[in-house]
């Protein structure tokens, strides 16, 4: 038996790649300096994996921004608008990821979507009529050669053709089948080039196989692979799946002329059942047995019990998915040993794979005994009062009265907002000064009084600016918050916070998910102080800003000893208490963000309601069910596919919902219209995840497109998302254009 991983974190132990890349974006270092730093980081990571005793090391799992974008460049799926710019290859790459606005042209970034049911986001390639798929890139070969020069025979990794086609966008008049033959040739060219360099195997990632597949999709998969595998150029080919099981294509998959198949034994409900039904003796099974998405220690006894039931003769132990979804290492954390011993980040998961392999080979008795001892400990007790509160909930606790239509009329009369009311999503730019003051306060270098005075001053500035430029509903800017989940978690019992537990979310952006350690209750009011202060500075309504229970759960590392449903209800009651305190303090518009509602939706439609929506939607309703009818509840969602769960979103029973929409060309509007969506909506009118400022007329056109699909009485005008990561200059320029466009649109109503 041997060991491997599907992929390793890219940003570095201390987010070195992030900080170096951001220096490049600011023109503080050259492209050559960026590439050299990335090369050093890859070597460091390969060496860590090697020293931990992992026998098969992947390469090309690294990325400067996103591995899906890497594949687009590898296969020449690059829009003509970017090719026509006089930019270097690296500049083109970042233009697709972030947009480009300069002397050489103006192009928007490609759309960004959630990577299956994770908090990672991938850049969505677009096939045009002019797209000519071919082998065009060199990164996969360069990185294989880099590793080889270090004495490492790695297994190059690339997105497989089926997943690439399934997750890409297509221009009107273009479809996936148009590119099958060219993809077959391109992948075989990759095989040939790798074989020429001395590679012996390749990993093709096909997570799209774990979703519900139609007959046409299965036919596409088989057509691609029967032809690609007809000439493997001497390479051993591994088809790697993750995030679930492959029940729809298992029999077809095991009968392909492939050398190895990677299956997920952590999230794959039916994986063990499928394999027990038979696995070919001539193929190697890569068994994903160590959870790549959560940070709890692996229970060796449970994992070994699964492995003992696998009939495959040749097994390689691996992670259930890439380790980019967990932090780098626990070595830099400051938890007490009694706590820290329960956690395994990416580096520690390498140890777990090595331990399991050793135990399977009749060694490792000491590590097995230590693991048994760890799991024999009762980690944390239950909060009896909280459990009783949840047990006492009834249907009435999940129902807001009066119904939406009556509330809508009451609120329009109460607020007297103009048509197309304008607002922002919540946060304003957090400058170096803001971050420095927060850090100084946390280090006790700044007193509470000094910090409060600073926050009051900056809130005053932004309230005044919003009033001057003409926003209808204001926000306080969230300057006191480092992260929309961590900030709340710090005021809830049952939460722990890592010092360096960063995980890549998109591009160079990292998030530091808190850890749900025990039962969750609110310790004290969280947002009332600054929301009330901001409201006292203006006669216009100021939104209270909260993170919803499902998002807090989904953007935390959840417990594994109770269900995520029970954890979410605990969080919902804590946020409900905060909502009622805000309302009592005179905050009449309260936004409860559910940015991650879609994130943990099961990948198979048959599981959507029973396994998720049947408790996630009620959890949100529980939060706001008892507010007064003239209190307006907003929510916000971003960077996910929402069109297939529109009825469930309407059932949240919010009064207003804002969506990310600009990068996806407002595709959600047709579905809102078709589903007779009742909630008032604010489709984002410009993309905030790019530093690009909308051109004159651009937002006007977007608003026209919105009003063609949604009645003006139902429309709000807002950006896509919060503005925390943007610069002040670009933010004010973009928001001014938003307001000008909204005012112009009102004149035409």
From Swiss-Prot:
What is the main EC category here?
A: transferase
Q: Which residues form the active site?
A: 689 (proton donor)
- Where 5-methyltetrahydropteroyltri-L-glutamate binds, per the record, is at 15-18, 114, 555, 599
State one molecular function term (GO). zinc ion binding
- What remark does the entry make about the cofactor? Binds 1 zinc ion per subunit.
> What does this protein need as cofactor?
Zn(2+)
Q: In which pathway does it act?
A: Amino-acid biosynthesis; L-methionine biosynthesis via de novo pathway; L-methionine from L-homocysteine (MetE route): step 1/1
Q: Name one GO biological process term.
A: methylation
Chain positions recorded as L-homocysteine binding sites: 425-427, 478, 593
- Per the similarity annotation, which family is this? Belongs to the vitamin-B12 independent methionine synthase family.
Function noted in UniProt:
Catalyzes the transfer of a methyl group from 5-methyltetrahydrofolate to homocysteine resulting in methionine formation.
The identity of this protein, by name, is 5-methyltetrahydropteroyltriglutamate--homocysteine methyltransferase
The organism named in the record is: Streptococcus thermophilus (strain ATCC BAA-491 / LMD-9)
């Amino acid at each position: 038996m041997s060991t491997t991983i599907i992929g390793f974190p890219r940003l570095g132990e201390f987010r070195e790649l992030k900080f170096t890349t951001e220096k490049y974006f600011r023109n503080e270092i050259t492209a050559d300096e960026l590439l050299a730093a990335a090369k050093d980081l890859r070597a460091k990571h390969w060496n860590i994996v090697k020293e931990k005793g992992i026998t098969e090391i992947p390469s090309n799992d690294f990325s400067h921004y996103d591995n899906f974008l890497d594949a687009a460049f590898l296969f020449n799926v690059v829009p003509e608008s970017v090719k026509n710019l006089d930019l270097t290859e690296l500049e083109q790459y970042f233009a697709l990821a972030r947009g480009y606005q300069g002397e050489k042209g103006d192009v928007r970034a490609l759309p960004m979507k959630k990577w299956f049911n994770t908090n990672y986001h991938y850049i969505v390639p677009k096939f045009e009529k002019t797209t000519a798929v071919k082998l065009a890139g060199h990164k996969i070969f360069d990185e294989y050669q880099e590793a080889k020069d270090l004495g490492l025979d790695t297994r190059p990794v690339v997105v497989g053709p089926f997943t690439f086609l399934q997750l890409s966008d297509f221009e009107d008049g273009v479809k996936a089948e148009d590119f099958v033959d060219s993809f077959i040739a391109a992948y075989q060219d990759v095989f040939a080039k790798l074989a020429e360099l001395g590679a012996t195997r390749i990993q093709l990632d096909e997570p799209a196989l774990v979703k519900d597949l139609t007959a046409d999709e299965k036919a596409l998969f088989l057509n691609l692979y029967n032809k690609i595998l007809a000439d493997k150029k001497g390479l051993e080919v591994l088809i790697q799946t993750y995030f679930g099981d492959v029940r729809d294509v298992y029999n077809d998959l095991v009968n392909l002329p492939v050398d190895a198949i990677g299956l997920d034994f952590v999230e794959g409900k039916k994986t063990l059942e499928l394999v027990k039904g038979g696995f070919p003796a001539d193929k190697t099974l890569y068994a994903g047995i160590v959870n790549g998405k959560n940070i709890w220690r692996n229970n060796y006894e449970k994992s070994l019990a699964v492995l003992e039931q696998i009939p495959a003769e040749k097994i390689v132990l691996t992670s259930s998915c890439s380790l980019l979804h967990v932090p780098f290492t626990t070595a830099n954390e400051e938890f007490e040993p009694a706590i820290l011993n329960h956690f395994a980040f990416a580096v520690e998961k390498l140890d777990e794979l090595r331990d399991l392999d050793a135990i399977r080979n009749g060694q490792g008795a000491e590590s097995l005994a230590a693991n048994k001892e760890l799991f024999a400990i009762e980690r944390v007790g239950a909060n009896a009062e909280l459990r009783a509160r949840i047990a006492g909930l009834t249907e009435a606790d999940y129902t807001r009265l009066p119904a939406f239509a009556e509330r809508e009329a009451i609120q329009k009369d109460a607020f007297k907002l103009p048509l197309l009311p304008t607002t922002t999503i919540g946060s304003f730019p957090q400058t170096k000064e803001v971050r420095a003051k927060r850090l100084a306060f946390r280090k006790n270098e700044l007193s509470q009084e000094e910090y409060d005075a600073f926050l009051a001053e900056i809130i005053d500035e932004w309230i005044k600016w919003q009033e001057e430029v003409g926003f209808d509903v204001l926000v306080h800017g969230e300057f006191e918050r480092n992260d929309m989940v961590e900030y709340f978690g710090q005021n809830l019992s049952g939460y722990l916070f890592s010092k360096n537990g960063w995980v890549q979310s998109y591009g160079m952006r990292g998030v530091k998910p808190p850890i749900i350690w025990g039962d969750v209750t609110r310790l004290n009011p969280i947002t009332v102080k600054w929301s009330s202060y901001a409201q006292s500075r203006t006669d216009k309504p100021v939104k209270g800003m909260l993170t919803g229970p499902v998002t807090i759960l989904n953007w935390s590392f959840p417990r594994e000893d109770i269900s995520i449903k029970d954890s979410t209800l605990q969080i919902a009651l804590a946020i409900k208490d905060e909502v009622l305190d805000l309302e009592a303090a005179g905050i009449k518009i309260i936004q409860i963000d559910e940015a991650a509602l879609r994130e943990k939706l099961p990948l198979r439609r048959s599981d959507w309601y029973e396994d998720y929506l049947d408790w996630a939607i009620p959890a949100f309703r529980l939060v706001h069910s008892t507010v007064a009818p003239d209190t307006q509840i907003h929510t916000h969602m971003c960077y996910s596919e929402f069109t297939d769960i529109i009825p469930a979103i309407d059932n949240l029973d919010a009064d207003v919902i804002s969506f990310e929409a600009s990068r996806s060309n407002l595709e959600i509007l047709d579905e809102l219209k078709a589903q007779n969506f009742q909630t008032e909506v604010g489709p984002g009118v410009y993309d905030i995840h790019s530093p690009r400022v909308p051109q004159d007329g651009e937002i006007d056109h977007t608003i026209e497109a919105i009003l063609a699909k949604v009645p003006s009485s139902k429309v709000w005008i807002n950006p896509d998302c919060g503005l925390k990561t943007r610069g002040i200059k670009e933010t004010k320029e973009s928001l001014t254009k938003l307001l000008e466009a909204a005012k112009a649109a009102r004149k035409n109503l």
